[in-house]
Regions:
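Bacterial Sec-dependent N-terminal signal peptides
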Residues: 1-23
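Extracellular/oxidizing-compartment recognition motifs
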Residues: 23-353, 362, 377-383, 399-407, ...
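Carboxylate/His-rich catalytic cores and anion/metal-binding grooves
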Residues: 254-256, 363-391, 441-443
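Alpha-helix N-cap/helix-initiation motif
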Residues: 325, 355, 410-414, 430, ...
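Aromatic-lined, polymer-binding surfaces characteristic
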Residues: 329, 356-363, 391-403, 409-425
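Structured segments of extracytoplasmic/periplasmic soluble domains
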Residues: 339-342, 388, 392, 428
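Well-ordered alpha-helical scaffold segments within catalytic/enzyme domains
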Residues: 365-376, 420-437
């Protein structure tokens, strides 16, 4: 009888553990496209927290601070692995957690619109599931939330319809350091909890590629003053960058930051805008952009103290090499390598400015080039591309690209034939020997 009681207790405890589920938390009122949401939660950790597991998903991108220190810069992947589901980052042994009181802060950027590389959901928010030993902390109604007051969408020309990202404006006079441990969030609202089945997020699917590689803040190759208000900063190559500026100014001065690729492909892409506060200050653009030069348009009475850039990108090593006596071919190799690398991030891309879209006419070239020039991490992006292509099939089983996408569903037959043929799936298989993926897409 005692053994039966023990068994019943164990089963009940397992049922209880199974029913604990991290839901999606959001702002309790309507969230407009291009909004930035702040979330905070204080947790108490009993023992050593160095070994932990964090599962975190967002629509659309997130930044994570633990005890005031930035731990994840631009987490999350554009939606999604198929038309219904959402990617989830799974992070092992996240740094910064300590025994006792800990403050978790999250900033979420909600695209709120469709694009050639992203399918929008109706729910701006975050799902958090943190396990430390036997303790578990989830996104529930105990979290606090606020709309970040500094972010706004500039009034200028909007990015073309292929991009789900909006231009990003930031007003430093309204800045709140909400990630600080001692920040007072008592005036914030309680989050709204939404069950996954009602969110439009579908199932959470593990992120199949590495987190971004952060190369740190670096000096430009050179900076030239082109006029009283225009500074041109030269990058070492076409790169995915977050431009940075340190300056001294009066409050309310408007600074425009964009690259020479702003109209790459002819249509408007993305740019950043910054409104100064009074005094010495720093600003780093939150959204990445690409180009060979960064153009800073700055009022005359603003004193520029420093200009830098942060390159981030797909986490792979430039492992291949080529050299010969002809400098033309050496230069061609270097340019080709940089062209390949800059078209890799959430997906392979046709271009990193106008579309950021996974057209398979480009992917078949890129996946083949990766075998000669990059390490094995690159092939995870190819595998992701293959699975997405097949998991986004229409109801009649035909395939189309680019995917993921929210405002495109047309088939380009020649690209689709290339994807499933010699230069696509077959090249991937011959280079990796990954039978499981091939079996999955050729059932």
């Amino acid at each position: 009888m005692n053994e039966l009681k023990k068994l019943v207790c164990i089963l009940l405890s397992l049922i209880g553990m199974h029913t604990i589920q991290a839901e999606i938390i959001t702002y309790p009122a309507e969230v407009t496209p291009g909004s930035w949401l702040c979330f905070r939660k204080e947790i108490s950790v009993e023992k050593d927290a160095s070994h932990n597991l964090l599962k975190i998903a967002a629509d659309s991108k997130y930044w994570l601070w633990i005890n005031g220190e930035l731990v994840v810069r631009e987490g999350g992947l554009k939606r999604g692995p198929n038309p219904k589901d959402t990617y989830c980052d799974i992070l092992q042994d996240v740094k910064g957690l300590v025994p006792g009181k800990n403050t978790i802060a999250l900033l979420v950027w909600y695209f709120g619109k469709e694009g050639f590389s992203h399918r929008n959901s109706p729910t701006a928010g975050i799902s958090v599931d943190l396990t430390i030993g036997k303790q578990r902390y989830i996104s529930d109604d105990s979290w606090k939330v606020s709309i970040h007051p500094s972010f706004y969408i500039p009034k200028g020309i909007k990015p073309n319809f292929r991009l789900p990202e909006s231009n990003i404006g930031f007003d430093a006079e309204k800045k709140v350091a909400f990630w600080d441990k001692d920040f007072d969030d008592t005036q914030w609202k309680n989050v709204k909890v939404i069950k996954k089945e009602l969110s439009g997020w579908g199932q959470l699917v593990e992120r199949p590629i590495p987190m971004w590689k952060d190369y740190g803040l670096k000096d430009y190759v050179k900076v030239e003053r082109k006029s009283d208000t225009l500074l041109v900063a030269y990058l070492p190559y076409n790169a995915q960058v977050n431009p940075y500026i340190k300056l001294k100014a009066k409050a309310g001065r408007l600074i425009d930051i964009r690259t020479d690729n702003y109209r790459g492909g002819g249509t408007p892409n993305v740019y950043a805008e910054y409104i100064t506060k009074s005094g010495i200050q720093e600003f780093e653009a939150w959204g990445w952009m690409n180009g060979h030069q960064v153009l800073y348009t700055i009022p005359k009475d603003v004193e520029v103290l420093e200009l830098k850039f942060r390159e981030t990108g797909y986490d792979t090593e430039l492992a291949g090499s080529f050299s010969c006596e002809e400098q033309f071919y050496n230069k061609l190799w270097d340019k080709s390598l940089r062209t390949l690398y800059i078209t890799m991030r959430d997906t392979y891309m046709d271009c990193p400015d106008r579309e950021r879209a996974q057209w398979w006419g480009d992917v078949v070239n890129e996946l083949g080039e990766a075998f000669y020039s990059l390490d094995q991490n690159a092939h995870l992006l190819t595998r992701k591309a293959i699975l997405e292509l097949m998991n986004w099939q229409r109801p009649d089983s035909t395939i189309f690209a680019p995917v993921p996408a929210g405002n495109w569903n047309q088939e380009l037959p020649m690209q689709m034939l290339a994807s499933v043929g010699y230069y696509g799936f077959w090249t991937y298989y011959m280079g990796t020997g990954d039978k499981n993926t091939i079996k999955a897409v050729y059932p």
